[in-house]
Amino acid sequence: MRKLIFLLPAAAVLTCCGLKELGEIVPEPGIPDYVDPPLPKTELVVTGLEYPEGYDWNRPETATGAPDIVMYRGDKLVLRIPTGDGYSVSEDLDMHRYIGGHVYTDYSSDTHTIVSRDGLELFRYQGRERIVLLAEHDGHVLTLGESRDGRGFSSRVDGVPVFIGFDGSVFQNAGVSPGGELRFFYRLPVNSTSGVIYLYYAVVGADCVMIELPSDIVEAYGFAFPETPSSSAAEETDAVGGIKVLCRRSVKDVQDATQMEIFDVDAGEGKPVRASGFFSSVRAGTVLSDAAPLLAVFSVSSLFSSRTAVYSGARCWQEWSRSDIPTGFRHLGDSVAGIRKSLYGSGVDILCNGYVRDTLPKGYTTMTGAALCCTSRGIKVGMTSTSGGRAILWNEGKVDSLMFRGIVTSVTEEPVVLEGE
């Protein structure tokens, strides 16, 4: 139907359909008067370490000066934090993280652990800890730290202790419950007549429950809380209900040597999973996500070959041709994506559903799994130059030069917040 701007047809519209603005199109019967809403506008937030001109981060022992932690929104620099002992900010890659619009840092002095936000100290506490989890909830900062002497850990809210373990170590998959409490697993080594064995515990808030496993489980590689657990562990069933374990049972013959299980603690039974082909041993394993679907990874090897197996939600059983477990695994819709250093020289492989989807430019590498960003809009990877040049961003095949010279530490895609919202 053509849009007519003449007076006479417009008058007809006024007569037949009621009062309409002149020139407005009236939908024909049977044609919906709506269109699909556009996707919300997003922007990329990139954090990194920016080094002074001439600094060689491949040979830091010969370099002078110190990097700054930088944060960019698109092409705009919005934050710069100097590092060094005088600022109580470390240049180590794992001692800063981007959360909710802010950069949080942790630092260990000779006597204290110091937590800062955007370069300003929030709190400090006695003892030297490495922060393995930092999260925000209702205006509070939650931390889980491991002692730098290798024994003991503590969970805290705004620096105040909630749970302290004087021995043992945090064992993967720390997170925050829907009720806003820190939840994590830890293991405690115990001497026995057969050697050292491990006892495993689940902690939610200030409550701790031992996880009882069958005696024929010879090794537990990782644990996952249920997707929507109770926010309280006051009852044992609330603390352990739905917890799953990636584990290996004792084997009767060599063909079962690589069979793994996803063991349901509450049900007391496991679901066998195994890599196809003949492999004689399991080299390593981990549970990388406790979100639905559960994502577990392990590597297997034989005399002649090795590979990495990925288990995702009981329906995605993928395998890669190398045994080194890649970094930065993410769910990508119904798929599983990851990154690893390329087998052939420099460059980075993007893995998706068991195959190498793309090999990113030679002369660049990734330094942390947080440099991988997966959203409904696709895959983005922040990459660091191995020759000392500018960092780049790989965005679904398109490569853009970033605004700083240094190491990319995280890439996050967020909705654009307009002024006044």
Task: Give, region by region, the residue ranges found by the protein language model.
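Sec-dependent N-terminal signal peptides
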Residues: F6-P9
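Residue-level hotspots at or immediately adjacent to binding/recognition sites across diverse folds
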Residues: L19-E421
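C-terminal motif of bacterial Sec signal peptides marking the signal peptidase cleavage site
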Residues: T15-C16
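Positively charged n-region of N-terminal signal peptides that target proteins for export
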Residues: M1-L4
